[in-house]
Amino acid sequence: MNFKKPATLVLVSLTSTGGWAQLSSPPNAPVQDMGRVEIKSNRDNDTEERRQSTAAKIVIGREELDRQGDGTLGEVLKRLPGVTIQGAPGRGGAIRMRGLGGGYTQILMDGQRVPPGFSIDSLTPEMIEKVEILRAPTAETGARAIAGTINIVLREGLRANPDDLKVGSSFENGHRSEGLNWVHNIKSEALIGTFTVSAMNMWRPEDNNTLTDTEVDALGKLPAGSSHRERHTENLGHRQGLNANARLMWRGEEGKTLVLMPFMVYSEFNSLGHIDLTESKTVGGQSQSFSSDSAQTSNNSRFVMTRLNGQWNQRFSADTRFEFKFGLGESHYSYKFNQTELGTSGLLNTMTEAQAFKDLSQSWNGKLTQVLQNGHQVVSGLELEGVRRTEEAVADVMDDAGNMRARTQRWAVYTQDEWSINPHWNAHAGIRYENILTEGVTSEGAKRNQSAVLSPLLHAVWKPQPDSKDQVRMSLTRSYKTPTLVNLVALTSLSREANSPTRPDRTGNPGLKPELATGIDVAVERYLTEGGVLSANVFRRNISDLIRYVTSERYDTAWAPGQRRFVSSPQNVGNAITQGLELEAKFRMDQVWTTVPAIDIRSNLSFFHSRVLDVLGPNNRLDQQPSMTANLGGDYRIRSMPLTLGGNVNFNPDYTTRRSNEQWAYQGAKRVVDVYGLWKFNPATALRVTVSNLVPRDYLTGTTYIGNGFSETANTNTRNWQNVQVRLEMKI
């Protein structure tokens, strides 16, 4: 990949703002009286934790989490370096690091993998103490993190803090939603703890328009001709949710502590919608038919999850500590979709789909930490995890979708050592072995998959001077991505409308192998004297046995033997390479120019490039990885009044992905502007106004299939709207 042009542009921009050298004080610079006293904030502690870590880590604490008044954690993460959100602007979606999601990005909660079915959008910033982002895996956090790891640390109890209460309403396209967040701190002598409750009553409109064009030439298996379909869908969804978690810590004698962390999520969603569909066909160059149809739809779903995490710490001596963690969880999900045809053409069938699953999960982790006399800190651990799923599904499209029983068992053992080689060098080396077994039984028979991976991992930090604020990080790692339960043993899902390359049936593949990646990361960091950081990071991952959904034309399916069906299933398609450049700058403007206002600047710029070697180019990139992502944000406190103003601009360009020699996918550009104002009436009461997606733009996506004398393109336009939130924030 050629990074010269982007890198040059960034260097020019840094130079124009005074450069790195200007942002730090010269060693012998005289002390100037600035006329005010600077007080260190929690943000400085987050920056210091980042600087002291041997493995590359970004820490986002309470100050950053609260800054913009975001409604979900995903809205906070989208502004971080290299992080993108899948889907339309303002609609949430899967979190992706370096443009990679779907198993490439590992999500942890309090250091443990999140339970099945958990959505990061179910967490509000008020429920979280801090977020740690690791760009390279470690033996302790796990190697299933080709793109990186996001560790969410839930709220911790602090004796001195009063309760927090936040009540607000938001408005989107004429629909009002409400939300409440309450944080209660326990202040007893024997117990330190926090209870957090978040409730929502949200209305969300949706408006999609899909145009599908199909052509069959003389070489196809159908008569030469073409068709044009236009599908317009409108929905109004209503979501009600209640999330609660607690962190309770008892301190015993001689370094003994017990922490219990119960967690509960309840979410119910209902929507009513309307579909209008028209289709025109041409055969032999002459109009053959024109049809139209419409339907009413209803969608009802419910998700309930309860989980108890626990942690026991036992300090045997000043240098030896044992930690035991456990997690027990249960989740239930039910879903029902009804479609009622209003016309008579048969383009939209009257149908019902229903699905329900139950997951039972448990995890048991033990870790021993020893500080040796020669300065080495050795951590060794054993992990056990099990998940059982029972699923029932019914669909009227063809036959019953059937039932499924599946289980996943995982165990891992690891050891790592962190030490200081000399005042200039720190190192962190580890090795991890992990074994995963997945078994399932469906109406299509029994399926089984087992994989084992050994991952050596090495990190190092070099400082030009022992007390230097400049440092260079290096990582050489082995990471991997395992097939998901859905990839391996999923029930066959049939297309609701006429089967085609852009509306295929979907099924699993029990023969998948895990993706393996060898990676290297190199970063240069400068920590500024008065707070802030400048960093540049380059990375590369060489991936083997890449997993990708591929659509094929089949006549031998078990559910429609002898019929022509387009089927999408996951396959190991070969090898891939991904690499990138990540730049970050966080500073206060008066650190550069003393005469300008003290505006806090947060900016990052990332460039990505990838190639799937067994797919012809151009655009043979990894799925849904943009070529770049950028954020520019700022905050300013007006000193003459109790008002703080701020905002952020997020940008992802449009791009095309060639998924196979016959398939292409298009993702439109995303430009999201968020602004806010915070008025403090007194230290305990404030009013916040936030405008998300200030300048809404339609979001475009598309898919194309060309092969065997058959071509089809489907383009979807998704509308989105400005969201205005008004929230009262109180400390009680």
Model-predicted regions and their roles:
Residues 36-68, 93-94, 102-105, 158:
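N-terminal periplasmic "start-of-domain" segments of outer-membrane beta-barrel proteins
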Residues 73-76, 93-96, 133, 145-167, ...:
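N-terminal periplasmic accessory domains that precede
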Residues 74-112:
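Extracytoplasmic beta-strand/coil segments of soluble accessory domains associated
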Residues 301-305, 357, 406-408, 478-543, ...:
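Outer-membrane beta-barrel signature, preferentially recognizing the C-terminal barrel domain
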Residues 427, 535, 539-542, 560-655, ...:
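Gram-negative outer-membrane beta-barrel transporters
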Residues 651-658, 678-732:
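C-terminal beta-signal and adjacent terminal beta-strands/loops
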